[in-house]
């Protein structure tokens, strides 16, 4: 995108600076904290750091995932950890298989949501399109949107009918998008804690434009078909 900007070529989605902010999940969470947007307590680590439970900045249960990457790679039934041995094992596994540092967050046990974003590049107005992502219970009794569930398309995506939650998510998603200096369109993910309070999880300022979460957020909120979505993204990118 930098090359396109330098050469005055129009493009869709955000610039390189914004993409770098959201691609590192810890960096994105720090930006949210500065913007007073709630996100779970966290730290980053890799094998050899935080060598015992006393060195842990936050207490169990925790959620362990790669600090970068998409499609829930590195996330499975063992991502929720309740003790130091399982934490250590998961951190090592991510380093070995994903070649990544880990983002370790306080585990949030509530519902999962994603909010599609359209920003009008002329007026600056932002449209938020919340959806709920429902996942079946795994063998450990948890509802985790893991790699296999995404790969096999086993999750269920539904409209957010609760007006209070819809409005909460819409406001937070818009604030998050602005904090990351997003352009044109994107997607912001949230998860509830056990009390039903939404927490920022991560952002995707260049979401896939196949029939994934962004498309489904357009369909469920705007009754927009796939062709209409593509034309809107393209037209907006040309302004």
Residue positions per predicted region:
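A short, GP-enriched loop/loop-strand-helix hinge that lies immediately N-terminal to
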Residues: 1-23, 38-41
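ATP-dependent carboxylate activation and anion-phosphoryl transfer catalytic cores
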Residues: 36, 163-239
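Active-site nucleotide/adenylate-binding loops and adjacent lid/helix of ATP-dependent enzymes
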Residues: 19-105, 109, 121
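Short coil/turn motifs at secondary-structure junctions
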Residues: 47, 120, 136, 206-208
């Amino acid at each position: 995108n930098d090359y396109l900007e330098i050469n005055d070529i129009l493009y869709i989605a955000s610039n390189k600076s914004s993409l770098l902010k959201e691609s590192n999940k810890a960096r994105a969470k720090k930006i949210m904290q500065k913007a007073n947007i709630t996100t779970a307590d966290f730290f980053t680590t890799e094998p050899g750091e935080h060598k015992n439970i006393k060195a842990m900045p936050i207490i169990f249960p925790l959620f362990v995932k790669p600090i970068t990457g998409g499609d829930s790679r590195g996330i499975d039934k063992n991502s929720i950890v309740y003790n130091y041995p399982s934490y250590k094992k998961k951190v090592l596994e991510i380093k070995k298989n994903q070649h990544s540092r880990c983002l370790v967050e306080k585990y949030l046990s509530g519902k999962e949501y994603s909010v599609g974003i359209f920003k009008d590049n002329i007026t600056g107005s932002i449209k938020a399109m919340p959806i709920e992502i429902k996942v079946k219970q795994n063998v450990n009794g948890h509802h985790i949107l893991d790699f296999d569930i995404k790969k096999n398309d086993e999750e269920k995506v539904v409209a957010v009918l609760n007006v209070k939650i819809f409005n909460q998510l819409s406001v937070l998603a818009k604030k998050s998008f602005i904090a990351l200096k997003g352009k044109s369109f994107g997607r912001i993910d949230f998860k509830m804690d056990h009390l039903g309070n939404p927490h920022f999880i991560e952002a995707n300022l260049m979401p896939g434009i196949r029939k994934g979460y962004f498309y489904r957020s357009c369909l469920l909120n705007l009754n927009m078909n796939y062709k209409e979505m593509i034309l809107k993204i393209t037209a907006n990118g040309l302004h």
